[in-house]
């Protein structure tokens, strides 16, 4: 794989994959960006936006009319104004990054003619109205809400549409399957139609009391006969001399068991004897022989049902009603009346059951009115119905677009399931839909068709940010609509403007509530770039409108065949959320209907083409799909005649002839998620461990020096690029200027005369992430380097040369070591600590606010009562710590004093106070101190002042620095712009004939660079040449230059104005100071580490280097792991990685040796030869010049990086070959010596390089001690947990232990003075102060609580403290 990128030439990965990838992997955060863009539609012109997203919301709520229809408020268009603060400012100030929404509304006032009621337009007013702020998405697919970065997780929910299901025989004791159908709209009432145990069909609306389904049909306008004719065919029985003649139909008579002989009505022959069953084959044969009709006797008619009312034509008397069962009595009466033809219902109790007819029979309602009243009573119990209100209510339930919306998806799904052809735009229910659902349900009961699988991805869809936000905004607008209607009716409509009718608060509040407190709006996991990307690609089944943890059964959580290539079967949390929170697969995308699609290559006549098609789960069900690793020949034909495919609706794996294959996977990694695709040899790991591996990579802390893995999968670059951690060049160009905080590129392509030819990239330096890890970007380029569009020019946290680098490659030995690696513990070498291999920087943020209290304002100051000068040594005059100061637990960061409440003063005291001024005792020290367990360096201080409050010295100094930085930025940008523009101008004018110029220029002389240099640059614009096109270009350039210059200055002034303006602080806060402390955490015993294969452990001991086991060449192992951690866990991938990593390091060492030789001989041939042996004929390496080759060699000297993609990686033979190439034994094992004794270990040991991560479970964050601290108010027991500075819980079992030891006094102490004996605690303290060591325990407070609780239940409990009195003397017997 040739990687011709800027970073790809500096370090080339050897690629082991054999399968060529046809499809480009979609951008990994496309899910978020595309969805929100579709919602806002900023790019579309305001007048011509399509009807979706925000536009659709406004269209659905507007126009709003008042109650008398005398006026109407219409929506015209909306547009966004530029946001008030940019992303960085919002982060710093704790603001929300949002754009004000401006909506143009039109108010139309009508004149209404009182006699005719006709309306004529009286007045039209149009106005722009502010409708609140809409949060904007950052470049990386996140939102900034109140200064913190948040992600809106996409939700998986049941797709709208119709679903058929049964109860699996659980409802009724007989185990009979009860079928049910449910119509789920996007919003509106649910309609359930279900069978009961007696086979009567019922309908329920919104899970309320059930009604016979025929009542629903009556309400829809059908009568009894129509209902029967809709569901049953009519068969005409004709009277003949011998009996009744019945038309013979194969389908009707198949499976028919005869009681009497079956007789051909035309010939009178017996075609089937009594007591036999008519098979399908026999029935077909009879038809072929020409059997037209059968003869039936009278008794065989009994038990059938009439299809129509039988009426006396003269008198109108009804003899029998439609649906009535024929009995002997009825038959006798019909014969008497002389009926020659009987229309009967085609119900044979085998293929067609009498369910609807029975329901009709059981239904009490016989007319539409009765049915409507019944439905009204169910929906609104207790209200007396009128026909009008009942009709309106039924109409609004399913047929009113305001209240009921199937959505386009629901309509499409319904059409597909029921074979209907309603247009997508028809989003309410129709009569036909409901009848079709009932028909399909009855068909299921009759054994026709299949029930739906609700876990099929064709029946679950994804709601992403845009759609969630759309629903939220609609809720806000509907709340607003009510208020608008009321206001329109209550004001003088002729004089008001749209602005006066609208209060945008409900809409803004709905949005704020969604982003602030919705279950799906989550604090972004920003531990490392992978955790960011995974968080954005997450699919949750929880949240509003979704499932709950408790209700979700096993089926919903399980892996489904349709997840293939759409949802990762591996990555999901362990614990109660397992299977409810999933991750999108690498190549998956969400289509416009919200279904997850995955790409396949098309196969034509057994030949695989490069055409890529995205299929959703429903479409895929119709095709046979081969896997990506099926062997193909050079022309793309299958080499085998039978190809293993996933085929049919069940997606079973079956071999199929090559010419019947329809599609083929595009890549082996398309079935797993990003995190799982980063695990090399994933195919050799057990699924449970792979799950842990993919979850733990997200917890890896960015280290001080990132190092890409020797053994990667080729996904590392993609993740680093798409996560936004590493910076990619926006345009091709040359590096113009560079320092640690920014990179300036002069573009050489994509030059637009209207835009600046310079790109400036600002780097983030030592910023704090949401998880307190450190975000720091470092440039990778030098001045003069040429970069292409998309090349990585700066590394971010956990990236190395544009590749994701979550951990470090360390030399591991798999062997026991004195029990220190028992139970997955990890033994580390001191080298790891000394060389800062696993050192990370964490930035802690502390803030303090000075409020205006009732007793007076708090003050931030250096003048703190009762504090030594020593404690104030790090504070400046304003009382704020210096940047660069080293602080430890208990140090003051910001000095603050708070006024104290005091006892009322006597007049004398008041007089003395007035004369001698304030006394110091009325303030208390409430300074911000460093909490326990934190020790580090101050890296940043920010001071925020309320508007109108005087700034202190420190705030002014920070402001000056900031303004200087902005001015420098502006000047630099100006200089680059000048150099760029005047360079281009000189190129255009050079060698032209001058027809005009500045003062002193001779006309018609040639303009050269030398001539130009004589004049100041600002006068170059005065030169003119006789070429109109050229002059037009120069004029356009000048215009652009002036605009850019003006824009620069304006931007600078805006930013300075914002700086000086004062900050928006919470109410009551006068001033706020934020202090950032950088804490350096070295690895230490108790820290959690892990590999990428779910092999996790805790560091048990750090051993001096010389005591660690060493190899024959004297290299000491960095880490010793327990070999028993491998067999039972079945994650063999780690062993393969160890072998391959060792080969990589060995080859790196060889390259290092050739480079050392080069410095002696100045000959690069050996290096080229070595690289050719390792990489084969690699294009990238061939194209490097000597300098680049040397740089590549130096980068590879620690180890040669390789890529072994998942399911298509290095095989055993490849690993052995690599080991041999590196000069190692093919077994991957080595003789190892004991570092303490120097003796050789008996057996050879597996040694190699493994990629280890340090996880975000650091012992420093967990260790905690308390002597005195806060107590719970009610029980008076110490609080629990580190965050509350709580104590250790001495629980029930611990009490048993002390009881078992008989340690009575220790136990008494634990239960009283060390816990909740308030008086005893004080006494103990006093005793200690006195130097006395005796104390007495009292009554624990929790006992008093118990007594109080019992009293509250009406049980009087008294505790008598006196010693038990002697029993009263027994009275003498009389």
Swiss-Prot record:
Pfam families: RNA_pol_Rpb2_1, RNA_pol_Rpb2_2, RNA_pol_Rpb2_3, RNA_pol_Rpb2_45, RNA_pol_Rpb2_6, RNA_pol_Rpb2_7. The RNAP catalytic core consists of 2 alpha, 1 beta, 1 beta' and 1 omega subunit. When a sigma factor is associated with the core the holoenzyme is formed, which can initiate transcription. GO terms for biological process: DNA-templated transcription. The lineage of its organism: Bacteria, Pseudomonadati, Pseudomonadota, Alphaproteobacteria, Hyphomicrobiales. Its EC number is 2.7.7.6. One of its GO terms (cellular component) is DNA-directed RNA polymerase complex. GO terms for molecular function: DNA binding; DNA-directed RNA polymerase activity; ribonucleoside binding. This is DNA-directed RNA polymerase subunit beta. Keywords: DNA-directed RNA polymerase, Nucleotidyltransferase, Transcription, Transferase. It catalyses: RNA(n) + a ribonucleoside 5'-triphosphate = RNA(n+1) + diphosphate. Belongs to the RNA polymerase beta chain family. NCBIfam families: PRK00405.1 (NF001616), rpoB (TIGR02013). DNA-dependent RNA polymerase catalyzes the transcription of DNA into RNA using the four ribonucleoside triphosphates as substrates. It is an enzyme of class 2 (transferase).
């Amino acid at each position: 794989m040739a990687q011709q990128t800027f970073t790809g030439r500096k370090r080339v990965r050897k690629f082991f994959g054999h399968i060529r990838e046809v499809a480009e992997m979609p951008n990994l955060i496309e899910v978020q960006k595309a969805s929100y863009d579709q919602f806002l539609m900023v790019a579309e012109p305001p007048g011509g936006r399509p009807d979706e997203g925000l536009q659709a919301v406004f269209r659905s709520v507007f126009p709003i009319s008042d109650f008398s229809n005398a006026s109407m408020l219409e929506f015209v268009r909306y547009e966004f104004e530029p946001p008030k603060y940019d992303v960085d400012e919002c982060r710093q100030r704790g603001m929300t990054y949002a754009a004000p929404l401006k909506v143009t509304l039109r108010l139309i006032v009508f004149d209404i003619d009182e006699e005719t009621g006709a309306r004529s337009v009286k007045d039209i007013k149009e106005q722009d109205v502010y409708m609140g702020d809409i949060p904007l998405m950052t470049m990386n697919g996140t939102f900034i809400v109140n200064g913190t970065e948040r992600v809106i997780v996409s939700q998986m929910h049941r797709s709208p549409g119709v679903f058929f299901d049964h109860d699996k025989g659980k409802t009724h004791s007989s185990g009979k399957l009860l079928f049910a159908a449910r119509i789920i709209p996007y919003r509106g009432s649910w309609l359930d139609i279900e069978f009961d145990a007696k086979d009567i069909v019922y309908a329920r609306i919104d899970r309320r009391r059930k009604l016979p389904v025929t009542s629903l049909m009556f309400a829809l306008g059908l009568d009894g006969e129509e209902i029967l004719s809709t569901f049953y065919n009519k068969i005409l029985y004709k009277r003949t001399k011998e009996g009744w003649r019945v038309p013979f139909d194969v389908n009707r008579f198949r499976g028919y068991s005869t009681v009497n002989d079956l007789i051909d009505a035309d010939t009178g022959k017996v075609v089937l004897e009594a007591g036999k069953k008519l098979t399908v084959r026999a029935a077909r044969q009879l038809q072929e022989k020409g059997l037209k009709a059968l003869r039936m006797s009278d008794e065989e008619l009994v038990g059938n049902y009439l299809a129509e009312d039988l009426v006396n034509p003269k008198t109108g008397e009804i003899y029998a009603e439609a649906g009535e069962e024929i009995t002997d009595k009825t038959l006798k009466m019909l014969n008497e009346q002389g009926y020659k033809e009987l229309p009967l219902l085609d119900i044979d109790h085998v293929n067609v059951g009498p369910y609807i007819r029975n329901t009709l029979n059981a239904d009490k309602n016989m007319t539409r009115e009765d049915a409507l009243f019944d439905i009204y009573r169910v929906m609104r119990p207790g209200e007396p119905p009128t026909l009008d209100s009942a009709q309106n209510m039924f109409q609004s339930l399913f047929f009113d677009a305001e209240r009921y919306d199937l959505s386009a998806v629901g309509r499409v799904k319904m059409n597909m399931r029921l074979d209907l052809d309603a247009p997508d735009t028809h989003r309410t229910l129709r009569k036909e839909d409901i009848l079709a659902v009932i028909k399909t349900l009855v068909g299921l009961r009759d054994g026709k068709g299949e029930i739906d699988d609700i876990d099929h991805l064709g029946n679950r869809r994804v709601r992403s940010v845009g759609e969630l936000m759309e629903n939220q905004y609609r809720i806000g607008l509907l709340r607003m609509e009510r208020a608008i209607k009321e206001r329109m009716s209550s004001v003088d409509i002729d004089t008001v403007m749209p602005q006066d009718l609208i209060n945008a608060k409900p809409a803004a509040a709905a949005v704020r509530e969604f982003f602030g407190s919705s279950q799906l709006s989550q604090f972004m996991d920003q531990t490392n770039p992978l955790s960011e990307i995974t968080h954005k690609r997450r699919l949750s089944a929880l949240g509003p409108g979704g499932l709950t943890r408790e209700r979700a059964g096993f089926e919903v959580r399980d892996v489904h065949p349709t997840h293939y290539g759409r949802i990762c079967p591996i990555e999901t949390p362990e614990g109660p959320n397992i299977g409810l929170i999933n991750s999108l697969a690498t190549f998956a995308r969400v289509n416009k209907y919200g279904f997850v699609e995955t790409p396949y290559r098309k196969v034509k006549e057994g030949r695989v083409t490069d055409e890529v098609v995205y299929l959703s789960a429903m479409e895929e069900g119709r095709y046979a799909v081969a896997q990506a690793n099926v062997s193909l020949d050079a022309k793309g034909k299958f080499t085998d005649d039978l190809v293993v495919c996933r085929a049919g609706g069940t997606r079973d794996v079956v071999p199929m002839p090559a010419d019947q294959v329809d599609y083929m996977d595009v890549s082996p990694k398309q079935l797993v998620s990003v995190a799982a695709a980063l695990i090399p040899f994933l195919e050799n790991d057990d699924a449970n461990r792979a799950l842990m591996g993919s979850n733990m990579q997200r917890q890896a802390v960015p280290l001080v020096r990132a190092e890409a893995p020797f053994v990667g999968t080729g996904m590392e670059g993609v993740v680093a690029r798409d996560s936004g951690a590493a910076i990619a060049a926006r345009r091709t160009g040359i590096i113009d200027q560079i320092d640690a905080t920014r990179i300036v590129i002069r573009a050489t392509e994509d030059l637009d005369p209207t835009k600046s030819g310079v790109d400036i990239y600002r780097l983030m330096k030592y910023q704090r992430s949401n998880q307190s890890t450190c975000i720091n970007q470092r440039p990778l380029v030098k001045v003069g380097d040429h970069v292409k569009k998309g090349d990585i020019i700066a590394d971010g946290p956990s990236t190395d040369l544009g590749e994701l680098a979550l951990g470090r490659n360390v030399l591991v030995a798999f062997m026991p070591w004195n029990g220190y690696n028992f139970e997955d513990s990890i033994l580390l070498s001191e080298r790891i600590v000394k060389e800062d291999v696993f050192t990370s920087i964490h930035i802690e943020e502390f803030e303090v606010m000075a409020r205006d209290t009732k007793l007076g304002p708090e003050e931030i100051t250096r003048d703190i009562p009762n504090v030594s000068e020593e404690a104030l040594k790090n504070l400046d005059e304003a009382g704020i710590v210096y940047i660069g100061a080293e602080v430890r637990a208990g140090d003051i960061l910001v000095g603050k004093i708070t006024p104290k409440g005091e006892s009322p003063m006597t007049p004398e005291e008041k007089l003395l106070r007035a004369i001698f001024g304030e006394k110091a005792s009325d303030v208390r020290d409430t300074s911000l101190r460093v909490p326990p367990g934190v020790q580090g360096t101050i890296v940043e201080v920010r001071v925020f002042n309320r508007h109108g409050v005087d700034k202190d010295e420190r705030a002014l100094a920070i402001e000056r620095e900031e303004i200087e930085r902005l001015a420098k930025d502006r000047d630099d940008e100006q200089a680059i712009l000048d150099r760029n523009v005047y360079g281009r101008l000189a190129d255009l004018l050079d060698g032209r004939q001058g027809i005009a110029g500045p003062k002193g220029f001779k006309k018609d002389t040639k303009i050269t660079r030398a001539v130009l240099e004589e004049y100041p640059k600002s006068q170059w614009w005065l030169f003119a040449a006789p070429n109109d096109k050229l002059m037009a270009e120069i004029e356009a350039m000048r215009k652009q230059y002036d605009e850019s210059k003006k824009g620069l200055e304006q931007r600078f002034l805006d930013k300075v104005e914002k700086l000086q303006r004062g900050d928006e602080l919470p109410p009551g806060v006068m001033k706020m100071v934020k202090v950032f402390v950088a804490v350096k955490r070295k690895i230490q015993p108790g820290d959690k580490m892990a590999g990428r294969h779910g092999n996790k452990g805790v560091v048990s001991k750090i051993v001096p280097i010389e005591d660690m086991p060493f190899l024959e060449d004297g290299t000491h192992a960095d880490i010793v792991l327990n070999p028993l951690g491998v067999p039972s866990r079945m994650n063999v991938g780690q062993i393969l990685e160890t072998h391959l990593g060792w080969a990589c390091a060995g080859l790196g060492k060889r390259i290092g040796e050739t480079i050392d030789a080069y410095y002696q001989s100045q000959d690069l041939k050996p290096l080229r030869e070595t690289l050719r042996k390792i990489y084969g004929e690699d294009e990238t390496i061939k194209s490097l010049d000597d300098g680049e080759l040397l740089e590549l060699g130096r980068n590879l000297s620690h180890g040669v990086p390789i890529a072994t993609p998942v399911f298509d990686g290095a095989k055993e033979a490849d690993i052995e070959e690599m080991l041999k190439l590196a000069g190692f034994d093919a077994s991957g094992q080595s003789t190892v010596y004991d570092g303490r004794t120097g003796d050789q270990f008996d057996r050879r040991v597996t040694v190699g390089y493994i990629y280890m991560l340090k996880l975000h479970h650091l012992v420093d964050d967990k260790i905690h001690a308390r002597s005195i601290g806060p107590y719970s108010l009610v029980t008076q027991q110490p609080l629990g947990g580190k965050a509350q500075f709580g104590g250790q819980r001495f629980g029930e079992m611990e009490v048993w232990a002390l009881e078992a030891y008989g340690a009575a006094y220790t136990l008494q102490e634990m239960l009283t003075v060390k816990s909740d004996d308030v008086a005893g605690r004080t006494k103990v303290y006093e005793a200690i102060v006195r130097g006395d060591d005796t104390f007495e325990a009292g009554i624990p407070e929790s006992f008093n609580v118990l007594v109080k609780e019992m009293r509250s239940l009406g049980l009087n409990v008294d505790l008598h403290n006196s010693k038990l009195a002697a029993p009263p003397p027994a009275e003498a017997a009389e």
